[in-house]
Amino acid sequence: DDPALMELAASQGPVWIIDPIDGTKNFSKGKSCFAVMVAFLNQGKVQAGWIYDPIARKTCYAVAGEGAWCDGKRLTVAGAGQAIDQLQGSLGNKMGKRLGEVIDAGEHPHPVQVQRYRCCGREYMDLALGKLQFLQYAFHLKPWDHAPGVLIAREAGYFDGFFEDASHYDATQGVPDGYLMIAPDKAAWQTLRNL
């Protein structure tokens, strides 16, 4: 959270953001759920992003305005237009608790929540690959955890926005403290936000 590092991300010059071991706790415990994340920023925007799973030797990547791929295969959004109860994804503690209340009360249709991976990179990879259809993160959204993944998700066709005003994630704006949801489309995003 060093302010000087955040200023670099917002600069106009070329900046590389690298998370050499995303999912550090998993890695330190010998678990295979970790990733390497890299983002390239230039002129104040994320221009490219990569997420590498060294165990599976799989790479998801995107170039701004040109699309997203995984090992050469074009990635497209999964779950767009589907009923909310057909979607599964990862939620933070507060949203997960709220979903539990919705389920217990037998309220309206609800999505399926999966357990957090404790590795943003792998969650973003599974979103891009269609294994998950939504992700939600809250507070202290560091660019090394989100810049590559959000770009890959956007380029695959997902919608990202903060709960407060639906503004999109911007890696050059420091470390935002809001609720960020990535969903197949804006309609799903709104339904998930309103749980």
PLM regions: where:
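Short, flexible hinge/linker loops that cap or flank conserved catalytic cores
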Residues: 8-11, 81-83
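Generic detector of well-ordered alpha-helical packing
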Residues: 2, 20-23, 54, 124, ...
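An extended, acidic
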Residues: 79-195
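Short, isolated positions in well-ordered beta-strands
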Residues: 47, 75-77
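Residue-level detector of flexible, active-site-proximal loop/helix-junction positions
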Residues: 4, 66, 167
